[in-house]
Amino acid sequence: MSTPTNPEQPTDHPSAPFTLEARFAEEFPEMTTPWRGEDQPDPELAVLNEDLARLLGIDPDWLRSPAGVEFLLGLNPEPTTEMVAQGYAGHQFGQFVPSLGDGRALLLGEIRGTDGVLRDIHLKGSGRTRYSRGADGRAALGPALREYLVSEAMHALGVPTTRALAVVTTGRKIQRDRVLPGAVVVRVATSHIRVGSFQYANITGGIDLSRRLADHAITRHYPRLVERFPESGPERYAWFFRQVMDAQAQTVARWMRLGFVHGVLNTDNTLVSGETIDYGPCAFMDRYREDAVFSSIDTHGRYKFSNQPLILGWNLARLAETLIPLFGDTPDAGVDRAQEMINTFTDRYNDALHAELAAGLGLDADAPDTAGLIESYLELMRTHSPDVTTLNRTLSEWSVESTPPAGFEEWIPRWLAAQPDLINMQKTNPVYVPRNHLVEDALAEAVEGRWEAFTTLLGLVTDPFTRQAGMEVYERPGPDGFEDTYMTFCGT
């Protein structure tokens, strides 16, 4: 289980028991800058994900050692070959920025875990880089803990996501709207190759760099395409794009079933792996509202709940634009193929959403009545705005003594007639999610040095399908009116 660290654990492991690879840094020097983390005055390991450390093949006790903490801050070069800041571009709220990059982040390198999967180890809040654009490159403890908490909850919910290995406090005081304790969050992902990475490659290196990046991403994320298409050519890259579309469609469909609002779906926050990244302004809805917006910087609702599939389709169109020269033997052929493929995203998403909602309702996705039941369910959700998590878990535990939720009285008998699989529903619909009011309370207390609420919430949301005795308060939505004024912030 992921827990705050115990300072009494042994710390006498000076030698790094592993070595990181530097595949991305070595293959793409034109997209990276060698860098190191900034020195920190009083670093302390605040939270360590022991299970993830073991999956990576790293001894948790070594990570607790002084050498391990230095590694987690980007200061210990021993296990690494080359730490780098990555360059990328991006559309931010629809506006193209040609040079973004890791303004407060470092890629330490890649490591192959005990499961055989190659993953990045990446820092956030480790100090200024060449991409900082005047910012201080640091992160506050609260946002670092939010990323740890929510990303691990998403993993437990079965959502493709980056994960968090650790949070290290730095001993610095950093200025935001007020003075806050500084921290570094250590993120783990199957890669950090973004739509924005391809945009950057396209404008800085043209077709050759775009092809190399696509081949790297294919080898890393979709290796079966290498076997199917051993030679570079339009079919290889078209199938790569289709795979990315499917991965993103499945991810956003799961967001929509769970009531998750990402909040900042820029192209630099869209990974070709399909993993969810960047939890700064995210939120889980209590009441179902298709117009739900929580991010303080999303003033026009571009990334509201109901827009998320549309925005990801738009982001994927931007990816397709960078790959047009690879899609066909002529420019016109590349454009035609790109448009043809992009036009399929809506159907890919709708199929993924149908499968997700069918699973959530315990229904056979292929049964003739399922589509109608799902359509009626969504219409009732829009009309009555029930608490998303409570409603779905209530259905999962249905019995003859259950009282139909308000507005669902006529729908329930139709649903029961389809013989829903309640056992599988209980493995699909969580008891606990990181509800906004609980997250805010836990983070506020942890920043003040009181860790009990954070530890309790972390334990519940990383085992979300198991009801725990005496934890009823963690199942309930926030106070009346809380969501009407609640706002999230990027933490930058």
Curated annotation (Swiss-Prot):
The active site is at residue 268. Keywords: ATP-binding, Magnesium, Manganese, Metal-binding, Nucleotide-binding, Nucleotidyltransferase, Transferase. Its EC number is 2.7.7.-, 2.7.7.108. Mg(2+) binds at residues 269, 278. It is an enzyme of class 2 (transferase). GO terms for molecular function: AMPylase activity; ATP binding; magnesium ion binding. This is Protein nucleotidyltransferase YdiU.
